[in-house]
Amino acid sequence: MQVALLTFLVVVVVMVFEAIISRRHEKVLRDTGAIEPAEDVYVLMQAVYPLSFVGMITEGGLFGVASYSWWMVGAAIFLTAKALKFWAIASLGIRWTFRVLVPINASFVQSGPYRWVLHPNYIAVIGELLGVALMMKALVTGVISIIGCGLLIAKRISVENRALGRIR
């Protein structure tokens, strides 16, 4: 139970930190005329993403967390995913928010992880979920969370691509 509680605290502290960054960036973007597409799934993601962690950590707290070896594998995946996410945030700078906000006359970011992939932040999100699922031995909520968030991310990517003029 202590491991689950500690994991919960780490996840919450990092989420709050990310939310603060997002809100600051959002204010600047809105003040400078950034456009938000109407069909975004932000509201749904705002609930599903944190509830996924609550569910996985609760499952781990109730039924026991993973063995030390699997916990370490999960922690390594989680930390690697967070590193990728913060690299993506640093590369996007003020453009990174939880919402899809497109600045006026913006050019594509092609530095950092964006040199190799279009949406590294979402790869990181799936990595975060996988890492916590492994740490918590959350077989049920982990699978449900990864599939559910994966479907939302797929929709979100299509919204972002249309908003940025990248239709594939």
Regions found by a protein language model. Give the residues of each.
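N-terminal signal-anchor/start-transfer transmembrane helix
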Residues: 10-23
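Physicochemical signature of membrane-embedded alpha-helices that form the seven-helix bundle of GPCRs
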Residues: 7-10, 48, 77, 144
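Hydrophobic membrane-targeting alpha-helices
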Residues: 16, 57, 155-156
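Hydrophobic transmembrane alpha-helical segments in integral membrane proteins
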Residues: 1-13
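A generic, lipid-embedded transmembrane alpha helix
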Residues: 44-60
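Short, hydrophobic transmembrane alpha-helix segments
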Residues: 1, 58-65
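Cytosolic-biased juxtamembrane loops and peripheral soluble domains of multi-pass membrane proteins
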Residues: 22-41, 64-168
